[in-house]
């Protein structure tokens, strides 16, 4: 989904994920209407600015949320998939760069393994090598999960897309 700044792209993924409400309509998954709680279980959301949503814990604790039996090896595997090799698990996420924080947020969602992965500007502000790594990772995930990306740079994801939309005046318009 692409659209100009202020068009509601972030609001769209927040509504789909169940963290924001909506005025009318319904959200369905395989013909079943879902409430906000059901959508929160179904979806994983990676924000454009994930630093706002970390809980002040260590990297390891953020990864382990909801996964009490998660091993260090599983944490390292998820971090490696997003290009965060040799990251100190004891560090707070707030000490990481913006790009590292975004990749950590993606790693958290990889461990959750939601059926729907929602990404708000997943490559914004990342250097090219990291961008390419994230795009390659998403290409591997697209066969296992539904992925919805909102972006100002749809051309970066052209090889992943099966459906493209523009958000214009609150309407999703197929391209």
Give the location of each predicted region.
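Conserved ABC ATPase "signature" region
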Residues: 72-88
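ABC-family nucleotide-binding domains
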Residues: 127
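Helix-to-loop junction immediately C-terminal to a conserved catalytic motif
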Residues: 17
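Conserved H-loop
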Residues: 145-151
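ABC ATPase C-loop
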Residues: 109-110
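Conserved ABC ATPase signature
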Residues: 92-96, 100
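Catalytic Walker B motif of ABC-type/P-loop ATPase nucleotide-binding domains
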Residues: 117-120
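Conserved ABC transporter NBD signature motif
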Residues: 21-39
């Amino acid at each position: 989904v692409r659209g100009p700044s202020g068009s509601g792209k972030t609001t769209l993924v927040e509504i789909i994920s169940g963290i924001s409400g909506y005025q009318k309509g319904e959200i369905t998954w395989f013909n079943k209407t879902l409430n906000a709680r059901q959508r929160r279980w179904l979806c994983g959301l990676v924000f454009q600015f994930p630093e706002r949503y970390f809980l002040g814990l260590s990297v390891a604790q953020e990864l382990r949320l909801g996964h009490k039996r998660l091993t260090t090896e599983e944490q390292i595997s998820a971090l490696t998939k997003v290009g965060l090799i040799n990251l100190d698990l004891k560090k707070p996420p707030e000490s990481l760069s913006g790009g590292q924080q975004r990749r950590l947020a993606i790693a958290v969602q990889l461990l959750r393994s939601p059926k729907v992965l929602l990404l708000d500007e997943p490559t914004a502000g990342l250097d090219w090598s990291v961008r390419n790594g994230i795009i390659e990772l998403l290409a591997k995930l697209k066969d296992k999960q539904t992925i919805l990306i909102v972006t100002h740079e749809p051309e970066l994801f052209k090889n992943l897309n099966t459906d493209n939309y523009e958000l214009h005046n609150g309407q999703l318009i197929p391209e």
